[in-house]
Amino acid sequence: MSTSENESLDELSYARLVGERLRQIRQQKKLSLSDVESATNQEFKASVMGAYERGERMISVPRLERLANFYGVTVDQL
């Protein structure tokens, strides 16, 4: 495997882990994806949140910080 392939796998694994954690926290808060979209004035669209949670999309650090703030957790908890 090439270095770029390893990096892609690492990014994919990271995206999945963060996504799983995002879903766990959202569900602990008893929020639907639509609830998050509404409560954030559509900053976090339900479709995009779903992609983050499935690990299909990488979330940027600034967005991760805003989402952690919304959920009332630290970035480390995500």
How should each PLM-predicted stretch be described?
Residues 54:
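Short, conserved catalytic or interaction motifs in soluble domains
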Residues 62-77:
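DNA major-groove recognition helix of helix-turn-helix/homeodomain DNA-binding modules
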